[in-house]
């Protein structure tokens, strides 16, 4: 067990555990209040403890506990991030120095255990500072040759640049959402809350306030996401993955008395289980062929290592580092080995040894792989299973990040409180899917990556078109999130690893800003969400309006705002890929067009909410700016929405207008981007860099068109949107019905499922239960006849024997007279009888 106290990486572990500590405290307090409530009125001592724990109305105590936990987590993350930055540069330089030494002077590393350089020792110390794990459970393999090859379930952490910046983003955004929630959820502070959305026979529903419960769930949600980011293995990710799903279910269905909220929670949970089914299949394949869930071990065994004994691995005189090595199997009859002939289109992928010692050579044109490999032997996996493993993991990400065709749950998730929507859409649940795709990138084959790209492209376009016609302010943002997640997936699929994850980070800030801004509007308008009843709110809600405008500019990709740096990189990467693979030009065209659509519907939302004349005077007259606990988070998020991706000043000045020099993007690219990206997409990345300026100008032109249309329709009123609806009623209906995905799934899955369920119930009731009832009646019938037979025949015969015995006994009782002369007479008669018998017997014998 390593000396954990010397690991600065433990700051991130502490940051992860603080929210779960808040959850534990709130859970224990709630449980004690529940247990003490029945006795509080009867006993003064119990009542004192009950009041100490919050009493009937808990007040803001739970919010402060939850806020303290996540705020301290942010502080730990900030300190850890700064500390990591001071060491990552040295660690990166040492790594390249060691690799260079092995390439140039391979003979020096024949016996590394005897010739460790100072650089190697220093590198090991720095690397171990930021990782640690312990074995939680091991399921041993049945393959006796490698006793270590089994399912090793570790609990551990590994900090790299992606982990560090994700921690900063999640803890900061979650802290601001917690602060915002203190004001937004104030209605839940009442002992009795009247829910105007739920009607009963006695009027509106009345229930207890759930202020403490909300912050308890929020803390658990934050912990689940932080643990998912922290871990170094798929097993721990899957546990956190399911925890995130449970928390989303609890928070989306927070107002569970409302049918719409209950249905939305169920829908989110069920749709995500569909994706998780694929995730589990992927995990099982990885477990079977790799014997571990550790990311680094999987990646180093499925991708060709960088160096061998000769200093560099070459196949067909070409550098093979960081590539999949494929081939065809030639089984050896009666042996546990198979020969693999290397072939770029082979049906098998080589799995490299877990341990390489001494004079280790890379794969040759005909490599021997074991069917039951030891730690130092090659193995193999059918290529189609490797593809299936990647698709399975991606299927889980499709569900979690609401990608086509499992995007239907996310808009319905708006039934939860608005701060929950902000947390789900910005920093936790939907971010988890994109994060996992980025983390598992070296595992994905070209077929899987192309699938990811097309799924992202379809999603971003479909969701954007639906957002154009939405009138619920939260629904607009929901479809916007689905669309932006599609951008991230598209980028990852075409080799834009850095751009996709940079957009994940920038999107978190401006989407949290937009959702909290919409929450401020809803709160100020007394829970009105329909934009058709808003308008002209700018004078009354200036802080909310200005900060939301900053969010709109960022998501539209206006230069100098954070979204511009990441979205420009995505479009450039898509263009580079399309230029090298012209049959996939749609992968550039769709995101380019959608950039204009995004600008249109986001400015449409802002204009309809804050400009023009009030469309509902009752809403307008009662609207007001939100309290400081809600506006301060908006201001902080607005600042980050502008500058989080800015480049750092250099010797030439401050290149703010150079999207390729984003500081955050540079750090991710330089210290974290997998080498597999450069190998798989070398020419596409070069083309993207060469054409970045042209693509950027194209994108700005499309954004300008979107802004112009939104202004003409909803600000200046030159064009009438109602006329467009009348001219294209079919298109409007199609988009309003969300491309009929819900209806399609209802027709193909839900209704047939219900019909089958009813048929099964009918079959069970009429056939199975009927057969069981028939057997029961038959058993009842036979039991009755059995009872009669038992009573009449068996018991009758037994009773007859008893009666006969009883009669004989009674008769024999007459013999017992008690007189001596009677006994002498019986003895005499007995003697005569015996003599007669003996005489007859003797006569018979004599005659014989």
Describe the residue ranges of each PLM region.
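Alpha-helical transmembrane segments and their helix-start/interface "positive-inside/aromatic belt" motifs
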Residues: 10-16, 57-73, 266-279, 539-549, ...
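Hydrophobic transmembrane alpha-helices and their helix-loop junctions in integral membrane proteins
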Residues: 175-237, 246-625, 646
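Generic start-of-chain signal for non-secretory N-termini
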Residues: 1-25, 33, 116, 835, ...
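Aromatic-capped, Gly/Pro-kinked transmembrane alpha-helices
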Residues: 90, 112-161, 650-701, 712-848
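Membrane-entry segments of alpha-helical transmembrane domains in multi-pass membrane proteins
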Residues: 2-21, 57-68, 151-170, 210-217, ...
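Transmembrane helix-loop-helix hairpins at membrane boundaries of multipass inner-membrane proteins
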Residues: 1-6, 10, 31-212, 216, ...
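Hydrophobic alpha-helical membrane-insertion segments
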Residues: 68-88, 275-290, 548-559, 633-660, ...
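Membrane-interface interhelical loops and short amphipathic "cap" helices
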Residues: 1-11, 53-54, 85-98, 114, ...
């Amino acid at each position: 067990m390593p000396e954990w106290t010397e690991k600065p990486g433990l700051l991130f572990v502490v940051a992860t555990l603080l929210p779960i500590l808040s959850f534990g405290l709130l859970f224990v307090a709630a449980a004690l209040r529940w247990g003490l409530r029945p006795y509080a009125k009867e006993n003064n001592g119990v009542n004192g403890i009950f009041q100490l724990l919050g009493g009937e109305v808990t007040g803001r105590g739970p919010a402060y506990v939850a806020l303290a936990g996540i705020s301290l987590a942010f502080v730990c993350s900030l300190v850890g991030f700064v500390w990591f930055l001071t060491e990552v540069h040295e660690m990166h330089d040492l790594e390249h120095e060691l690799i260079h030494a092995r390439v140039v002077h391979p003979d020096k590393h024949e016996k590394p255990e005897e010739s460790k350089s100072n650089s190697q020792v220093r590198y090991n110390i720095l690397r171990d500072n930021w990782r640690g794990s312990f074995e939680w459970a091991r399921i041993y393999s049945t393959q006796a040759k490698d006793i270590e090859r089994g399912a090793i379930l570790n609990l551990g952490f590994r900090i790299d640049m992606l982990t560090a910046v994700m921690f900063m983003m999640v803890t900061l955004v979650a802290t601001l959402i917690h602060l915002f929630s203190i004001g937004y959820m104030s209605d839940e502070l009442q002992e009795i809350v009247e829910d105007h959305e739920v009607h009963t026979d006695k009027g509106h529903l009345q229930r207890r306030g759930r202020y403490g419960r909300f912050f308890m769930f929020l803390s658990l949600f934050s912990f689940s996401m932080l643990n998912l980011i922290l871990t170094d293995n798929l097993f721990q990710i899957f546990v956190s993955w399911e925890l995130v799903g449970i928390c989303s279910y609890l928070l989306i269905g927070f107002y569970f008395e409302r049918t719409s909220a209950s249905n939305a929670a169920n829908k989110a949970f069920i749709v995500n289980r569909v994706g998780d089914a694929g995730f589990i299949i992927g995990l099982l394949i990885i477990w079977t062929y790799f014997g571990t869930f550790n990311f680094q071990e999987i990646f180093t065994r499925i991708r060709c290592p960088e160096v061998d004994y000769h200093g560099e691995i070459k196949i067909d005189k070409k550098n093979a580092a960081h590539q999949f090595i494929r081939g065809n199997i030639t089984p050896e009859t009666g042996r546990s080995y198979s020969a693999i002939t290397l072939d770029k289109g082979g049906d098998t992928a080589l799995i490299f040894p877990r341990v390489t010692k001494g004079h280790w050579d890379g794969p040759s044109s005909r490599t021997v792989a074991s069917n039951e490999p030891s730690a130092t032997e090659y193995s193999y996996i059918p290529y189609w299973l490797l593809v299936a493993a990647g698709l399975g993991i991606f299927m889980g990400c499709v569900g979690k990040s609401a990608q086509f065709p499992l995007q239907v749950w996310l808009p319905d998730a708006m039934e939860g409180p608005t701060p929950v929507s902000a947390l789900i859409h910005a920093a936790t649940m939907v971010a988890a899917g994109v994060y996992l795709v980025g983390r598992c990138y070296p595992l994905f084959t070209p077929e899987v990556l192309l699938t990811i790209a097309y799924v992202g492209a379809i999603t971003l376009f479909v969701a954007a078109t639906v957002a154009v016609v939405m009138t619920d302010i939260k629904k607009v943002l929901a479809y916007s999130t689905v669309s932006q997640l599609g951008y991230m997936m598209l980028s990852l699929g075409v080799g834009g690893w850095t751009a996709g994850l940079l957009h994940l980070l920038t999107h978190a800030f401006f989407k949290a800003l937009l959702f909290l801004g919409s929450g401020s509007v809803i709160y100020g308008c007394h829970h009105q969400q329909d934009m058709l009843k808003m308008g002209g709110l700018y004078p009354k809600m200036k802080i909310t309006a200005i900060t939301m405008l900053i969010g709109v500019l960022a998501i539209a990709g206006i230069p100098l705002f954070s979204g511009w740096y990441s979205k420009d990189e995505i479009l450039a990467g898509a263009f580079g890929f399309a230029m090298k693979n012209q049959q996939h030009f749609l992968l550039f065209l769709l995101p380019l067009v959608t950039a204009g659509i995004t600008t249109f519907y986001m400015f449409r939302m802002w204009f309809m909410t804050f400009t023009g004349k009030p469309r509902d005077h009752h809403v307008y007259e009662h609207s007001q700016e939100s309290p400081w606990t809600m506006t301060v988070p908006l201001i902080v998020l607005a600042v980050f929405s502008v500058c989080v991706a800015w480049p750092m000043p250099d010797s030439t000045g401050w290149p703010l207008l150079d999207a390729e020099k984003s500081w955050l993007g540079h750090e991710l690219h330089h210290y974290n981007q997998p080498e597999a990206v450069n190998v798989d997409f070398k020419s596409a990345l070069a083309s993207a860099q060469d054409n970045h300026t042209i693509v950027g100008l194209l994108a700005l032109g499309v954004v300008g068109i979107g802004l112009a249309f939104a202004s003409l329709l909803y600000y200046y009123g030159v064009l009438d949107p109602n006329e467009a609806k009348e001219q294209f009623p079919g298109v409007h209906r199609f988009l309003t019905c969300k491309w009929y995905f819900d209806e399609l799934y209802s027709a193909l899955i839900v209704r047939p499922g219900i019909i089958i369920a009813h048929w099964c119930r009918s079959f069970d009731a009429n056939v199975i239960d009927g057969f069981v009832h028939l057997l029961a009646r038959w058993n009842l019938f036979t039991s009755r006849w059995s009872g009669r037979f038992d009573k009449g025949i068996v018991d009758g015969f037994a009773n007859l024997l008893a009666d006969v015995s009883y009669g004989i006994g009674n008769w024999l009782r007459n013999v017992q007279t008690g007189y001596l002369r009677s006994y002498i007479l019986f003895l005499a008669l007995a003697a005569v009888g015996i003599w007669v018998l003996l005489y007859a017997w003797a006569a018979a014998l004599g005659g014989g």
